[in-house]
Design a protein with these regions (language model features):
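Sequence-level detector for tyrosine residue identity
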Residues: 31, 35, 48, 65-70, ...
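Low-complexity, serine/threonine/proline-enriched polar segments
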Residues: 38-41, 45, 127, 131, ...
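Generic serine detector
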Residues: 28, 34, 43, 64, ...
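Small/polar-rich, solvent-exposed N-terminal microdomains that initiate assembly or binding
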Residues: 1-86
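Short acidic, gly/pro-rich beta-turn/loop elements at beta-sheet edges
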Residues: 81, 109-111, 190-194
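Short, charged interaction patches at domain edges and termini
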Residues: 1-29, 86-92, 138-196
Length: 196
């Protein structure tokens, strides 16, 4: 099961159907879980994502869209799940993923400032998913919680594309990163299941 991919897709759907469900955000590029390339020789570092089992470069920032977003997993921690009953274990595992959502928008097209969009995205990212939303009974809990944001556009761009990259952001560009955590409690057997 591509657990994290599915959760990010659900999170994107939640954002687009909720806090971003308005005309200003209809021309959007919404990417799933993305990764940074490891530069070879002089090739530039850049984010990419997998779509239909093919590698696709993330077009961000791209001013042909009013808005774009992609997510990266920065690290995963594992925590104990307290047993609720007596026995040899409850078969549950708790993963806490530190994530970053990288957001670009064109202020002229959306008519929103960086701070306005940051607040909208943060409000939408703070969400606890139900089992019904996730489509599997093996997941006990999926909760996204915003931790902090970096609205220094140049620093975020440099972190994504490297020191040597020319930052092409225009005055009307809104570009920032939101760090959030995903807490996932699942049955261990859920991780090898392919039913969802």
């Amino acid at each position: 099961m591509k657990l994290l991919d599915k959760i990010i897709d659900e999170l994107n759907d939640h954002l687009m159907d909720g806090v971003l469900n308005e005309q200003a955000f209809q021309n959007s590029a919404v990417y799933g879980l993305s990764y940074l390339t490891v530069p070879k020789d002089d090739s530039p570092q850049r984010p990419y994502t997998w779509m239909d089992d093919n590698i696709k470069e993330v077009a961000n920032p791209d001013d042909s869209y009013a808005f774009s977003i992609y997510h990266r997993c920065n690290g995963i921690a594992f925590k104990d799940v307290p047993q609720q009953t007596f026995g040899d274990g409850n078969g549950l595992m708790n993963m806490v993923c530190e994530m970053t959502a990288i957001v670009y928008s064109d202020r002229y097209k959306t008519n929103y400032t960086q701070e306005d969009i940051l607040m909208k995205i943060s409000a939408g990212l703070n969400h606890t998913f139900t089992r019904t939303q996730m489509g599997t009974s093996g997941l006990q809990k999926v909760k996204a919680t915003v931790l902090r944001a970096n609205n220094n556009s140049t620093a975020v761009f440099t972190g994504e594309y490297g020191q040597e990259a020319n930052c092409p952001l225009a005055m009307n560009s809104v570009y920032f990163g939101i760090v959030y955590q995903l807490e996932i409690i699942a049955h261990s057997s859920c991780l090898s299941c392919t039913n969802c």
